Amino acid sequence: MNQSLLVTKRDGRTERINLDKIHRVLDWAAEGLNNVSVSQVELRSHIQFYDGIKTSDIHETIIKAAADLISRDAPDYQYLAARLAIFHLRKKAFGQFEPPALYHHVVKMVELGKYDNHLLEDYTEEEFKQMDSFIVHDRDMTFSYAAVKQLEGKYLVQNRVTGEIYESAQFLYILVAACLFSNYPRETRLDYVKRFYDAVSTFKISLPTPIMSGVRTPTRQFSSCVLIECGDSLDSINATSSAIVKYVSQRAGIGINAGRIRALGSPIRGGEAFHTGCIPFYKHFQTAVKSCSQGGVRGGAATLFYPMWHLEVESLLVLKNNRGVEGNRVRHMDYGVQINKLMYTRLLKGGDITLFSPSDVPGLYDAFFADQDEFERLYVKYENDDSIRKQRVKAVELFSLMMQERASTGRIYIQNVDHCNTHSPFDPVVAPVRQSNLCLEIALPTKPLHDVNDENGEVALCTLSAFNLGAIKTLDELEELAILAVRALDALLDYQDYPIPAAKRGAMGRRTLGIGVINFAYWLAKNGKRYSDGSANNLTHKTFEAIQYYLLKASNELAKEQGACPWFNETTYAKGILPIDTYKKDLDAIVNEPLHYDWEQLRESIKTHGLRNSTLSALMPSETSSQISNATNGIEPPRGYVSIKASKDGILRQVVPDYEHLKDAYELLWEMPNNDGYLQLVGIMQKFIDQSISANTNYDPSRFPSGKVPMQQLLKDLLTAYKFGVKTLYYQNTRDGAEDAQDDLAPSIQDDGCESGACKI
């Protein structure tokens, strides 16, 4: 290697290249790692050096060289590359490797307008010194390379135009904790700050993108998911559209319920005009969703919901596919089809489904969610009433069209609205659940807006986070983590701003949280269980029982201290009804694990003191934040031992946790013979989870005789999910062979919808 090359320093001076210095940094970064070769990294990077190269470019080149060596056989290169990247990142942020004192850092950032000045108003210099003593900067060294790149790209406070970075990860964690607990009493708050900081910086609790990137800055909107219901009037349609624009501009993912909109040809003003139908209004919503791009990267994302029995359903089911013309397609949203038991019964009995315009059948639309017996009574009555406009379709044909579109686009989702209301934390008579959100894990009550400042409407918000099952040794640890997650997210509801009165009203009244899990696949592998063979059923029951029990207990304790949420009386919890009372009893045939916690004592305590939060749990996808914790995505099986995610910094490779020891214990997605085992586990989780679950179905056409997935199989899985009480189905993934090219490298699914961290964590 040519020792006479000149390099340009960060301050503009030039000097001879110092290869020893580079070697020392590499040695430091490789310490304690297995199966990594410093000389290999040096060889790969030296050939890219040139005369006059900047020291920062040398650093980037070495990092890239190490990252390119990450593989199944040498997973530790992900830590070598990460340490080099942290070194580089701190040099960029602080001008040196050692971070500054926390107090001086905060003062400087507040002056620059990067941090919210409430930090300096709420905490004294002395308290900042105490917080500084809580920080363990060495935890930066536990990140994988993919995590550091995600931090740089999405989470650290920066100038997105110049690329300047202003902080390191441990400052992010301690300041999120400081902001969330800033209104707690002086004598206890630093204790909570320390405990919360420790939980998030050791990856035991995973936070969603809006919280990681936004809390501590002057922008205060951190809800991941927003649910907006539209009425059947022009005022309501316009109010919905305005609400969408307001929330899309603030990084949220949107769920739209447009099921009330009357069908094509319905009379308007007593027949003076006839209605243009749903599609023009769906296009209007699509334009609103795509109006604000996040940092110029891409527009927002939404899932729009409608009932299966809507008169226009056959035109609505095909809106996403790539046939048809611009006029009859609305491709840039995803869709959720709402179904109930009566529809499934008609399918099983070979009957018809009758389609109506909601405007022609008084009471039917509301009963669809609030009262299944009343829905059936009205539905049959309207079927037999010749004066009402309707269309009959064979149930099997309608279901087949829906499943065919789900298979070809992957993005037609399912909501079983009866399960969402019969196994729900809300009393369907006063607070029915009429829609879900972008990623199908939220189930909250909404009311249509009549104008954007309508105080009587209700826009539902959900604030998310997750427990990292890979970072805990026993389920007992969940008790402390539940206390921290519930308290932090509950405090966030008071800390954030609300662009729309109807959103603030609902958030303050219901105080809904959605706490889920990441790293479930690692938890199964670690415990020697598999998705597909039933071996994980009892463990899953035990795990999710613990999660829901500890979350309810934490919210109940918080209610004793700060009062129950104002609309607690609209929940089933207020009547002493718990998830263990209303689950689908078909699950008892596939799991025989007893209950392990004292639910009866908890029931009494909830009846007496209430809950601070109407909902506590939801199982969301976690593509991005699971990379920070080096965890597997949500409850999903991994697609490969090494996943690849394309980012603006090139390819990020991530190896499944503890690969060397557990490679034979992981069950990969396409090794699962069918969806049965997975759907059973989702049903068992849903027994305890009070909202819903982003559950996917997966098909490998090569497993079937004709190389095609038979319709019968698709319908069977849909019915299996319903049988086990599954509330919602999210993506349908079809294996196309492309991802098998490199044996263990699996592309991570690119879901434009949730990239911003909207509705997922």
Predicted regions and their residues:
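Core nucleic-acid recognition elements
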Residues: 1-3, 36-174, 178, 191-197
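Alpha-helix capping and helix-loop boundary segments enriched in small/acidic/polar residues
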Residues: 13-17, 164-167, 187-191, 211-217, ...
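A glycine-rich phosphate-binding loop feature that marks nucleotide/adenosyl-phosphate handling sites
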Residues: 44-45, 63-65, 79-87, 199, ...
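Terminal amphipathic helices with adjacent charged low-complexity linkers/tails
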Residues: 77-113, 149, 339-341, 420-451, ...
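Catalytic alpha/beta core of large soluble enzyme barrels
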Residues: 124-151, 440-446, 489, 493-494, ...
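Function-dense linear segments that define catalytic or interfacial modules
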Residues: 157, 164, 171-189, 193, ...
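Internal maturation/activation junctions in enzymes
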Residues: 199, 482-504, 508, 529-622, ...
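Polar, glycine-rich mid-to-C-terminal structural blocks
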Residues: 318, 327, 331-409, 417
